[in-house]
Amino acid sequence: MSNTPIELKGSSFTLSVVHLHEAEPKVIHQALEDKIAQAPAFLKHAPVVLNVSALEDPVNWSAMHKAVSATGLRVIGVSGCKDAQLKAEIEKMGLPILTEGKEKAPRPAPTPQAPAQNTTPVTKTRLIDTPVRSGQRIYAPQCDLIVTSHVSAGAELIADGNIHVYGMMRGRALAGASGDRETQIFCTNLMAELVSIAGEYWLSDQIPAEFYGKAARLQLVENALTVQPLN
């Protein structure tokens, strides 16, 4: 048992960021209601961060916060805020102003070295060979995730590496959770509520119709999510 009443530890969480492109609260409210209706198991009562960097017109922050909260989403912070007056209004409501992480500059390529003798590279993989049911969340840290059975709506797969689903995929699949943009998602039957690679995501209605219910492979190409047949 710890000798101190609290302990501070670093951690990370998967959060949705809502980028606001309209300053009218009623418009935002309706747009969010429409999105939530498309994937209620994923978005209903979800914690979200509001990004206001694209707002050009003045915004009534109190009304905006109420409009978003009325959908059931839980606003836990705001990012992309550069306006001093808006910052003051946000902080007055007790919401933190968050600073999004910047991409690191690429490091110089290391000098090639001769491989060590008698070493075999090991690729970690987490294997799930039972159905993943609604409400379950499977996380594969620092490795790939393979599911050999069905994934129900309302279930969530998260991996720092690739995700493979050899069954009907009805839930949510988030590959590259730690930011690896080279990861991919492979499904033999793509019917997902949401697919995401390194934060770039599609809801079910954004998956091209010709790939819905089909074997598919998803990856990022020029920072955009793409899908192609899984051969």
From Swiss-Prot:
Sorted UniProt keywords: Cell cycle, Cell division, Septation
Pfam entry (one): MinC_C
Phenotype upon gene inactivation: In a minCDE operon disruption (minC-minD-minE), cells divide not only at midpoint but also at their poles, yielding small minicells and long rods. Loss of polar localization of several polar-localized proteins including GroEL-GroES, TnaA and YqjD.
GO BP, sorted A to Z: cell morphogenesis; division septum site selection; regulation of cell division; regulation of cell septum assembly
Residue spans of biased composition, Low complexity class: 114-123
Family, per entry: Belongs to the MinC family.
Role noted for this protein: Cell division inhibitor that blocks the formation of polar Z ring septums. Rapidly oscillates between the poles of the cell to destabilize FtsZ filaments that have formed before they mature into polar Z rings. Prevents FtsZ polymerization.
Subunit composition and interactions: Interacts with MinD and FtsZ; homodimer.
Protein name: Septum site-determining protein MinC
Organism: Escherichia coli (strain K12)
Organism lineage string: Bacteria, Pseudomonadati, Pseudomonadota, Gammaproteobacteria, Enterobacterales
Gene of this entry: minC
